[in-house]
Amino acid sequence: RTRYLERISGPLLDRIDIHLLIEPVDPKLLLPESGARGRLERQRRLEEARALRDQVLQARAAQWARNPSGLANHRLEGNALHEVLALGRKEKELLTLCAERFSLSARSHSRVLRLARTIADLAGSDTVKTDHIAQALAHRRAGQTLDGEEDQESDRTLFSG
């Protein structure tokens, strides 16, 4: 994984909004269970998928209703972005601290804000809170530190404080 990431340029990585570390799936989990147990599991997964779909549709509806010209969050720029954020003091402090600590570029900074607004929409929140910003930053940084090494423990300390 590290060798692969080293081959991708910083500016290209900067254009990817969400970085996730995903563990391999146990092959046994890929085989469906048979009988009643399997039907119940499939039904549970279907209900989860429907709930997630509904959550996404509600978030999209909130964006279209709130944002200028009905733009999705990822299309907001400049003043339009800052108007829909209306960050409080704590949120601005966290964002400033993280921007300095992680040397966020202007592009990364804007992408974190857009992602935080989307996370807030998915949570059904009218305002962007520190938790939404922390989650957006965690998705932007997934396993990276200033020197490229994995260090999620120091991130947890920063985000929980």
Language-model region placement:
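Basic, amphipathic alpha-helical bundle interface domains used for macromolecular binding and assembly
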Residues: 1-149, 160-161
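Extended, low-complexity, charged intrinsically disordered regions
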Residues: 155-159
